[in-house]
Amino acid sequence: MLLIWAVQGWSALAKARKLKNPFPATPAALAAGIEVYTNHCRRCHGQYGDGRGEKAAELSVAPGDFTNASKMNRLTDGELYWQTTYGRRPMPAFAHKLSDEQRWKVVDYIRTFAASKR
């Protein structure tokens, strides 16, 4: 899914950058984020969030690498949420597939990939 070429220069709308995640990264939120990621993101973004999922080689654009702390730290939660919501080929939009809550919680979870590299 996701998420994101954000880490590769995909810019969100200015107002999206200011959005705040209403779901703190609690153990319950992260567990919900893991479920969403596993079901919708992992095939492209990979088990470890490194953009090396089983479908990655088939895509015209490499999936975002969420393990790159430098790039991930430059993105706001609002930008990641926006990119997940609206997508950009080949990544699908998830506005009608996932609830707002699910999209925010997957943002919480993908943040853990870069955090584990510090």
Residue locations for each model-derived region?
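C-terminal capping alpha-helices of c-type cytochrome domains
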Residues: 8-9, 81-89, 95-118
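Electron-transfer interface patches adjacent to heme c in soluble/periplasmic c-type cytochromes
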Residues: 63-78, 94-103
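Sequence/structural segment immediately N-terminal to covalent heme-attachment motifs in c-type
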Residues: 26-50, 80-86
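Electrostatic cytochrome c docking/interface patches
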Residues: 10-36
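Bacterial N-terminal signal peptides
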Residues: 1-4
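Conserved beta-strand positions that form and line the central face of beta-propeller blades
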Residues: 22-23, 48, 65, 90-93
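Short cysteine/histidine-rich zinc-coordinating motifs and their immediately flanking basic loops
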Residues: 54-58
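Short, non-ligating residues that shape and space the ligands of small metal-coordination modules
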Residues: 50-51, 100
